Amino acid sequence: MCQTYRIAICDDLATDRNYLSSLCEIWGSHNSYHIQISEFTSAENFLFNYAEKKDFDILLLDIEMGAMDGVTMARKLRQDNHTVQIIFITGYADYISDGYEVDALHYLMKPLQEEKFFTVLDRAVTKLIKNEKVLNIISVSEMRFVCPSARLRLCRGKQQL
């Protein structure tokens, strides 16, 4: 079965969005992943869509985009999502330290080096898999079975199911 990854590309330049999209497709094909790509022209556009369906695994994010910059958008996103892997892709080196504040996976400079980009996407998948395993362990460890008088009850924390 082919693993699916949902990638959001947020960049105000159509040429950059198209280029990133094609690189993601190549990377996905090389790794036998099914890639679902959504493109956004602004931070506001992304956040509006994200409010409806919070289902992205990887976010490729430009810094300079107009009214709201990428770092501000990442701060807003991190208020309720710490699992999406944020990768800043920009031509501005002066925002690198801001990437650490929002727990960005990486900060890539334009023009992109294809192999470096693919390596960073591989790291994003590794972190997603690790996060998924941690969530599964937490879910299983919260459940316990109790067998009083040959009657089974499934409990989650203090709540009987």
Model feature map: region roles:
Residues 6, 15, 33-36, 55:
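N-terminal glycine-/serine-/threonine-rich beta1-alpha1-beta2 phosphate-ribose binding loop
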